[in-house]
Amino acid sequence: MRAILIGIFFLTCGAVQISKAEPVALRDVIKTYANIAEAAYSDAHVTAQKLQVAVNMLIANPTPKSLATARQAWIAARVPYQQTEVFRFGNPIVENWEGKVNAWPLDEGLIDYVQGDYGTASDENQLYAANVIANTSLKIGGRSVDASKLTKEFLAKTLHEADGIESNVATGYHAIEFLLWGQDLNGTGKG
């Protein structure tokens, strides 16, 4: 019986017709790529706006509930944003701004206080433990900078990647993650 079934299987395999794929125009491929990218970035934008609303609510009314809501909004926003990562490779338009949204790793001490074993200084980064939240003035590039107002412009143009150091991350998902959950105390060993 088994031999008969195997024989029938192989006989029917030969009867299966395989058709060739139809040629596709390059403009159709590009249009499909653009449509998929637009949908992905649209989803990421919508969830980022919801995250902004949740963070604004947390700032206006800092409670355990508003913190939990902001954390959930961050998690919900990360998934669609991560799905856009495929579009950044080889795309200079995306590469130009992506570091302001998704830069990693970050020196957490730039933003806020950290555990004592984090250290207070770094040979590579003078802002390693600057704690911009607690300090109204910072020294960046050898000059004193007013840090009393943490505006979008200050964060994006002065603090983010200050002194040309990529780990000086002041904007984006990972900076928000640090502010919502605090310092990552899980170590730096193998995962």
Whereabouts are the PLM-identified features?
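Positively charged n-region of N-terminal signal peptides that target proteins for export
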Residues: M1-I4
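Bacterial N-terminal signal peptides
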Residues: I6-G14
